[in-house]
UniProtKB/Swiss-Prot annotation:
Disulfide bonds: none
Cellular component per GO, a single term: extracellular region
The keyword DNA-binding is assigned to this record: no
Function according to Swiss-Prot or TrEMBL: Inhibits platelet aggregation induced by all agonists tested (ADP, arachidonic acid, the thromboxane A2 analog U46619, thrombin, and snake venom snaclecs (TMVA that activates platelet through GPIB, and stejnulxin that specifically acts through GPVI (GP6))). May act by competing with fibrinogen for binding to glycoprotein IIb/IIIa (ITGA2B/ITGB3).
Family, as annotated: Belongs to the CRISP family.
Native source organism of the sequence: Tabanus yao
Name this polypeptide is given: Tabinhibitin 4
InterPro entries referenced in this protein's UniProt entry, alphabetically: CAP_dom, CAP_sf, P14a_insect
Positions occupied by motif Cell attachment site: 31-33, 220-222
One Pfam family hit: CAP
SCP domain segment(s): 64-207
Cleavable signal peptide: 1-23
Location within or outside the cell: Secreted
Amino acid sequence: MTLNVYFVLLSPYSLQSVPLPLTMQVIVPRRGDHVGCRNAGFGAHCGSNPQTPKLHQEHIKMVLQKTNWLRGVVAEGSFCYPKAARMPVLVWDDDLANLASLHTKGCVTETNKCRSTERFRSPGQSSYEISGDTLPSAMDILNFALRDWYLQKDNLTRKDIGSYPAGEDKGLKNMANLISDKVTAIGCGLTHWEEGKLKRALFTCNFSSSNVPGHPIYQRGDNFATKCAKTHPYYKSLCNSDEHIKPNK
């Protein structure tokens, strides 16, 4: 069911909860809530002193560089994977980032809440939680998360590339999100809080599309980028950012 829904997103970058008007056409789930609805602040699991720091341009640049590097080498056939015929370079999307930030403000890694946006009906999601007596810098947390997701390549096989497995996640979902050729955009958020003497942080990225069981993670080709209308000038094994990909198909 598709409805035009009007709601207010609270700023993921401020403890003052500044209202930001946002109009989205969302795909309303029959069960469960949208993460952007009735989200008045931090969740019950956030302990004390929760904060959602802003991700600056240097953080965004790093996420895009590392993610597109990985997509590029996978498209070329690294890790014994098939070459990708039409894998696009990723760009940052503010709507996906806002909803990722709202997700982290719940301080729970996995939820069933809908995260659709006007452009993207069924975004994928990857989360990473870290805790300790002290926390690393935001940049280090982002690096640790991307490395953790990347290492799932050891669980992702050529067979999985051709047909995303159904059932319980076997430690491959996050790597599959990173290299899906339906994904064109990414947006991330970070929240940290305290539980007694322990400090915790949750980093989440939303992807513009999610993998569907039984469908390929990406379309293989005899060589990389053979079906791109135009390749990216730097990531030459990836399609340019204006490649016409249908993320909702």
